Amino acid sequence: MKTTPGIFEHAYPTIARWVQASGWVEIGADESRSAFVRAWDPGGLVWEGEQHYATIEDALQVLEHGIRAWIAEHGL
């Protein structure tokens, strides 16, 4: 098992912790949802971003900050 963080974990530590715990993320267009990026936990949708981003990098940065803000707001 790898013990040192990889490139993704360095760039997006909150997303990495989120999906390694019990949450998951969705990235991409979905006919039933307007947001391009979304964060979920077992209770349902906890955060969603905008409909469009200039780049995937932009979407991931917003997702990183969105999950971090949600965690702080809910005292997790």
Question: What annotation goes with each model-predicted range?
Answer:
Residues 1-34:
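Short N-terminal "domain-start" leader segments
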Residues 37, 47, 75:
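Short acidic, gly/pro-rich beta-turn/loop elements at beta-sheet edges
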Residues 38-42:
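A generic structural motif
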Residues 44-58:
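A short, exposed loop/beta-hairpin motif centered on an aromatic-Gly-Thr core
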Residues 65-76:
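Short arginine-rich
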